[in-house]
């Protein structure tokens, strides 16, 4: 029953990823952690989230805004080693909670009409530094990039595709770091192997949903995921 529940979680998370371009880990990690432990949840979500990102990119690569991708990933390349250093200096649980509170505060401000413009490469690079640092420390690469892209003039399709590339690349780097430090265990692999085709199914369903929502509906779902990521960071696992 636990395996079946894990596979259902994977389908739902893949659908969210296919619709929005991100969010696999936001959905999967808290739920998988309750079923099999946090380390396994992060490993499973990392491996399958990368596959989900690849599927999204394959179907939407023509919509990717490459100048934004380059600016953000340059910053991410700086932020990842910074995060690896910081993780040895601070209590990562406290940092995760603080990050969650900040994300919720920013989400509330955005919902109340705050405008954050992030159209210049330097601002997008700083976003990448924050994303990489937080990703290495807490696994939360998404919120800085999601908030930044909301402050650009990109369409919903371009936002979705650009999120998939930037966060998928950052996720791959973080997954490699976790594997090198012994945090990806063999016991996670059977679930991953069984779930690979289900990721494709969920991703395709999410793409179908994306094709039928309005830009305003897409932005609303993205904001909901932002709030969920903030809450998930605060709630103990």
Which residues does each predicted region cover?
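Membrane helix-loop-helix hairpins that form the core translocation module of multi-pass transporters
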Residues: 39-112
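Helix-loop interface residues and adjacent transmembrane-helix termini in multi-pass membrane transporters
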Residues: 35, 63, 89-92, 153, ...
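Selective transmembrane alpha-helices of multi-pass membrane proteins
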Residues: 77-81, 92-112, 194-207, 215-237
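Cytoplasmic-side transmembrane-helix entry/capping segments in multi-pass membrane proteins
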Residues: 65-76, 96-100, 119-130, 158-165, ...
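Helix-loop junctions at the membrane-solvent interface of multi-pass transporters
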Residues: 58-62, 89-90, 112-116, 137-138, ...
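Small-residue-rich hydrophobic segments that form or flank transmembrane alpha-helices
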Residues: 3-70, 128, 132, 140-203
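Small-residue-mediated transmembrane helix hinge/kink sites in multi-pass secondary transporters
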Residues: 30, 83-88, 147, 207-208
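Hydrophobic alpha-helical transmembrane segments in multi-pass integral membrane proteins
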Residues: 41, 83-88, 92-96, 135-140, ...
């Amino acid at each position: 029953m636990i395996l079946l529940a894990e596979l259902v979680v994977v389908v739902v998370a893949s659908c969210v990823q296919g619709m929005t371009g991100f969010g696999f880990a936001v959905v999967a990690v808290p739920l998988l952690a309750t079923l099999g432990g946090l380390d396994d949840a992060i490993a499973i979500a990392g491996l399958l989230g990368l596959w989900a990102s690849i599927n999204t990119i394959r179907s939407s690569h023509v919509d990717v805004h490459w100048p934004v991708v380059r600016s953000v990933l340059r910053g991410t390349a700086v932020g990842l080693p910074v995060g690896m250093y910081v993780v040895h200096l601070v209590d990562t649980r406290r940092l995760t909670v603080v990050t969650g509170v900040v994300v919720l505060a920013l989400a509330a401000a955005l919902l109340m009409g705050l405008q954050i413009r992030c159209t210049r490469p330097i601002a997008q690079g700083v976003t990448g530094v924050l994303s990489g640092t937080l990703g290495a420390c807490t696994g939360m690469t998404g919120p800085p990039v999601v908030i930044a892209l909301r402050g650009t003039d990109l369409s919903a399709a371009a936002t979705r595709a650009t999120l998939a590339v930037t966060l998928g690349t950052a996720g791959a780097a973080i997954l490699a770091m976790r594997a090198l430090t012994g945090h990806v265990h063999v016991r996670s692999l059977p679930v991953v192997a069984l779930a690979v085709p289900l990721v494709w199914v969920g991703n395709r369903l999410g793409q179908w949903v994306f094709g039928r929502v309005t830009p305003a509906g897409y932005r609303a779902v993205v904001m909901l995921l932002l709030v969920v990521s903030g809450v998930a960071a605060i709630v103990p696992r």
